[in-house]
């Protein structure tokens, strides 16, 4: 049997840091309130730097390729999960292909599942390796949500940061991705939105979110999907070594960990330092944990994410 196995990870975050103390000067909020309600102390932001969605994706990809120890010429697919592409077209994936000077006889495309984008991209890549003969796939999660937040809205501007994370998936006989599950429900599409300026030229494409409703649904749906993927995989909760959640809200993360019976020290947390980096949050956290020596080859990881759409998903894998 052929598995899709993570061979390398990489990430990138902008240099500029926006702290809660900085936000106290911008909106009516406090460090104590943000930490209690969300769990974010600081976030990295593009601001006026040369960084953008494409450059961050490229830098994360280079680090993943380096760790994987592969020649970039062997990459036979690029999938980018992002909701904040630099262009409507071309895709971010094609721009990554250009900057990495990858060969042209490969597919390269973006998917937009908002904060669940990386898990969606990982699931698609897994299917191409299992069923279509792909050997090396570059999967990237990247977002620049600070470019679309309303900096006068204290309920949302405190949440987000910018960044990118990437993995190289390689066809392998040893177990890698065991299962993925993806769900969506467009009936809740109005709960998290950022409208395109194409149709309403006078509007500003600010992010809007009904936080209380999203929080309740996230706790419920993530709880259900982690149960579903564990049952589908035939594992017990005790077989999970690490939970790598989407870093949206510490209270949501704690609810999922409690449901799994996992202590906090078995949950990879970067939310305090990064904030919610949308599609980048899971690969950012994975990269940080691998490079810190926490997660090791052979560990069983549960990844889960929930975002606008509403779209949510989970992946269970052996590193």
Curated annotation (Swiss-Prot):
Its main location: cytoplasm. It is found in: Cytoplasm. One of its GO terms (biological process) is fatty acid biosynthetic process. It catalyses: malonyl-[ACP] + acetyl-CoA + H(+) = 3-oxobutanoyl-[ACP] + CO2 + CoA. Its EC number is 2.3.1.180. Pathway: Lipid metabolism; fatty acid biosynthesis. Catalyzes the condensation reaction of fatty acid synthesis by the addition to an acyl acceptor of two carbons from malonyl-ACP. Catalyzes the first condensation reaction which initiates fatty acid synthesis and may therefore play a role in governing the total rate of fatty acid production. Possesses both acetoacetyl-ACP synthase and acetyl transacylase activities. Its substrate specificity determines the biosynthesis of branched-chain and/or straight-chain of fatty acids. This is Beta-ketoacyl-[acyl-carrier-protein] synthase III. It comes from Coxiella burnetii (strain RSA 331 / Henzerling II). The lineage of its organism: Bacteria, Pseudomonadati, Pseudomonadota, Gammaproteobacteria, Legionellales.
């Amino acid at each position: 049997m052929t598995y899709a196995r993570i061979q390398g990870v990489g990430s990138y975050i902008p240099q500029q840091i926006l702290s809660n103390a900085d936000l106290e000067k911008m909106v009516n909020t406090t460090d104590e309130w943000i930490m209690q309600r969300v769990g974010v102390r600081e976030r990295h932001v593009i601001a006026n730097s040369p960084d953008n969605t494409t450059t961050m994706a490229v830098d994360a990809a280079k680090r993943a390729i380096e760790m994987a120890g592969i020649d970039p010429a062997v990459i036979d697919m690029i999938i980018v999960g992002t909701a904040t592409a630099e262009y409507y077209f071309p895709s971010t994936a094609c721009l990554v292909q250009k900057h990495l000077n990858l060969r042209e006889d490969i597919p390269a495309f973006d998917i937009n599942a908002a904060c669940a984008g990386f898990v969606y991209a990982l699931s698609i890549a897994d299917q191409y390796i299992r069923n279509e003969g792909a050997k090396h796939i570059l999967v990237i999660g990247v977002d620049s949500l600070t470019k679309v937040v309303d900096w006068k809205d204290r309920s949302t501007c405190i949440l987000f940061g910018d960044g990118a994370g990437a993995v190289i998936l390689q066809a392998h006989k040893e177990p890698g991705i065991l299962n993925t599950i993806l769900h969506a429900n467009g009936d809740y599409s109005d709960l998290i939105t950022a409208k395109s300026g194409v149709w309403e030229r006078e509007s500003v494409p600010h992010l809007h979110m009904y936080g209380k409703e999203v929080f309740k649904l996230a706790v419920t749906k993530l709880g259900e999907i982690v149960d579903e993927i564990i049952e589908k995989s035939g594992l017990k909760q005790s077989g999970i070594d690490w939970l790598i959640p989407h870093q949206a809200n510490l209270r949501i993360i704690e609810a999922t960990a409690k449901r799994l019976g996992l202590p906090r020290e078995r949950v990879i947390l970067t939310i305090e330092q990064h904030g919610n980096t949308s599609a980048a949050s899971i690969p950012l956290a994975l990269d940080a944990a691998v490079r810190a020596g926490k997660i090791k080859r052979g560990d069983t990881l549960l990844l889960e994410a929930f975002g606008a759409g509403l779209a949510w998903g989970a992946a269970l894998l052996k590193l």
